[in-house]
Amino acid sequence: MSDPIGVIHGRFQMLHLGHMEYLLAGKARCERLIIGISNPDATVTRFSSASPHRSLEEANPLTYFERYEMIRGSLLESGVSREEFDIVPFPVNCPELLFNYVPQKAKFYMTLYDQWSLEKKAMLEGLGCVVEVMWQRTDADRLTSGTEVRERIRSGQPWAHLVPPFVYQYMAQQGIDRRFREKA
């Protein structure tokens, strides 16, 4: 039996195929999936010693809206009905704000890769959330990373094979790939 509501979160600072595996695994576990975009803006982005690069400006080049559009378009492209998911801000670094965006009584789905993942899991459990770990892997087991995709775009290397088709098209149509290269 699936959960009525599930919550999943990430920065999605380049929605890639690893993210899609994560999102679709979460959706398979619930009737309605709420996708939280962490670091939605600079006002709620904080430093964490467990993952210092996540708070850097160069690690957060996409706006909340751009990430929202890429997630929405890619899920629709994957056959998920629009009625089955919502996308909201998820200020993970300001836990006191989380329940303004997501229901505390939902099931929170996570994957564990590193110390930062473990810290977030402990934080959510400390807030009284029920957390389900979908899988635990090492960084070496990742399909790809947002960092890798961003670096490939900036350096002119092939990257379309690392992202959903919608993301590749959206990046080109909006000139985001060009913006990345110009800032390199």
Region annotations inferred by a language model:
Residues 1-184:
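Nucleotidyltransferase catalytic core that binds NTPs
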